[in-house]
Amino acid sequence: MSESLLQTVVAYVELVLHHFMALSWTQQLSIVIVAPFIYSLVWQTLYSFRKDRVPLVPFMVPWVGSALAYGRAPYEFFGKCQQKYGDVFAFMLLGRVMTVYLGTKGHEFILNAKLAEVSAEEAYTKLTTPVFGEGVVYDCPNHRLMEQKKFCKNALSTEAFRRYVPMVMDEVRKYLRTSKHFMMNERSSGVVNVMETQPEMTIFTASRSLLGAEMHSMLDADFAYLYADLDKGFTPLNFVFRDLPLDNYRRRDNAQRTISSTYMKVIERRRKNNDVQDRDLIDALMTSAQYKDGVKMTDQQIANLLIGVLMGGQHTSAATSAWVLLHLAERPDIQEELYEEQMRVLDGGAKELTYELLQEMPLLNQVIKETLRMHHPLHSLFRKVTRDMPVPNTSYVIPKDHYVLASPGFCHLSEEYFPNAKEFNPHRWDNDAASSVSTGEKVDYGFGAISKGVSSPYLPFGGGRHRCIGEGFAYMQLGTIFSVVVRSMKWHFPADMKGVPNPDFTSMVTLPSEPCRIAWERRVPDQII
């Protein structure tokens, strides 16, 4: 900018300020309040004139945009927008332009986008780094994340699952015996809140199997609540603001420090005593967490990655297991079918459950699969656009620094793909009991070969390079939990519950809203759990 032009601009600014300061305070306040609305209206008008932009959902409040409608009921919001604009549209979310592409073509466009076009790291780092900690997951380059996934691969192998099943089974039995919510060896019935029991049950089973006996011995029910505080750090507000002086932010930070410190104590003790063996994921990371370029993960980064691994294996499993209990409370007929399947496969209880026997229980897997269809753990998957992205077969171009959003969960509830989509029906999978789509061309992003295709209408674990690597663990964990639970008790809704509660979308993880209780009774009154 030339000196003369700069002087002209400064002169105009001074003139405007002079006239502004000459106004009364009420006039000044009116301008300050009205100006953003005028700017927003002009911006939306100019946006609508551009033929290379996807349709934008109009909004009244500047910056906030459609945040309230989206945050309260995202699937309902998507459905209304789809009816008006089609599968591709944009909306304003707290100062960010979000381009939504619904349906299977949207899955392919966003989840299989080139690394040069979109970034999950830039989209999620404000949300995830305060929860997991620095240097891991989305607080590092993508190639580092791919290697971190590979470090965890052995803990998520079929051989590992064979070891985990007895551990998970033992933990569930122990929980049913000793938890204040059940105390089954002393009580024959009771009423429990599933969002109190299931986070505890899943944290105990995940920690016992993934982190080993030493770490597990340091955990109690309060540890599950710390992870719940981390869960509450996953909200649309956290997506925009990394730090705010609010209670849920403070609780998130306290939980992160406490959990990280607990892991560090174990790591430091093992280092000090030269006690690194091959017992659990902690040992595995302490011995093998070295990147291809020779850089080793620090112990603090290992602790942070452990938070991420257990978080991935806990918060979604807790939500899913809660939904399973709630849906089965409404379907005692399916409870009985599950019990009959257990008795048939386990020879009336004469056989102990194994990983191989879990694979012989199709209905159990179908219940989990149907629950994941109806309640995708994450209702929205984001990427930040790092290079202008043309939308195939349209004139639209999504500009750099906008965001793209895919919603497999919306597809899961579409009548186009799943007839009677709002009905819980595990038998819709009778001819397709496998956990997820696994056929077709494979691709290796650095952590093992996975299915390349993401155009399926059923993607409970996402797709592409950021696909969740814990699908096998989730089915093993949830299958083992409900094998024990179904053999131990029957359950239904208490009198004040009118059916399966609606989802609560205030968190990024789809949880059941309160009240979410079940009334249970022991299946065999004198049986020792």
Curated annotation (Swiss-Prot):
The subcellular localization recorded is: Membrane
Q: Does the keyword Manganese apply?
A: no
Q: Which cofactor does it need?
A: heme
Top-level EC class: oxidoreductase
Primary localization class, coarse: membrane
The UniProt keywords, alphabetically, are:
Heme, Iron, Lipid biosynthesis, Lipid metabolism, Membrane, Metal-binding, Monooxygenase, Oxidoreductase, Steroid biosynthesis, Steroid metabolism, Sterol biosynthesis, Sterol metabolism
Q: Which PROSITE patterns match?
A: CYTOCHROME_P450
Which Pfam families does the protein's record reference?
p450 (PF00067)
Q: Which InterPro entries match?
A: CYP450_sterol_14alpha_dmase, Cyt_P450, Cyt_P450_CS, Cyt_P450_E_grp-IV, Cyt_P450_sf
Source organism: Eremothecium gossypii (strain ATCC 10895 / CBS 109.51 / FGSC 9923 / NRRL Y-1056)
Q: Under which name does UniProt file this protein?
A: Lanosterol 14-alpha demethylase
* Biological processes, Gene Ontology terms: ergosterol biosynthetic process
* Pathway(s) annotated for this protein in UniProt: Steroid biosynthesis; zymosterol biosynthesis; zymosterol from lanosterol: step 1/6
Entry's Gene Ontology cellular component terms: cortical endoplasmic reticulum; membrane; perinuclear endoplasmic reticulum
Q: Which residues form the signal peptide?
A: none
> Which residues of this UniProt protein bind heme?
C468
What is the primary gene name for this protein? ERG11
Enzyme Commission designation? 1.14.14.154
The record's catalysed reaction(s) read: a 14alpha-methyl steroid + 3 reduced [NADPH--hemoprotein reductase] + 3 O2 = a Delta(14) steroid + formate + 3 oxidized [NADPH--hemoprotein reductase] + 4 H2O + 4 H(+); a 14alpha-methyl steroid + reduced [NADPH--hemoprotein reductase] + O2 = a 14alpha-hydroxymethyl steroid + oxidized [NADPH--hemoprotein reductase] + H2O + H(+); a 14alpha-hydroxymethyl steroid + reduced [NADPH--hemoprotein reductase] + O2 = a 14alpha-formyl steroid + oxidized [NADPH--hemoprotein reductase] + 2 H2O + H(+); a 14alpha-formyl steroid + reduced [NADPH--hemoprotein reductase] + O2 = a Delta(14) steroid + formate + oxidized [NADPH--hemoprotein reductase] + H2O + 2 H(+)
What GO molecular function annotation could you give as one example from this UniProt entry?
oxidoreductase activity
According to its UniProt entry, what is the function of this protein? Sterol 14alpha-demethylase that plays a critical role in the third module of ergosterol biosynthesis pathway, being ergosterol the major sterol component in fungal membranes that participates in a variety of functions. The third module or late pathway involves the ergosterol synthesis itself through consecutive reactions that mainly occur in the endoplasmic reticulum (ER) membrane. In filamentous fungi, during the initial step of this module, lanosterol (lanosta-8,24-dien-3beta-ol) can be metabolized to eburicol.
Q: Which PANTHER family match?
A: 24-HYDROXYCHOLESTEROL 7-ALPHA-HYDROXYLASE, CYTOCHROME P450 FAMILY 7
Identify its protein family.
Belongs to the cytochrome P450 family.
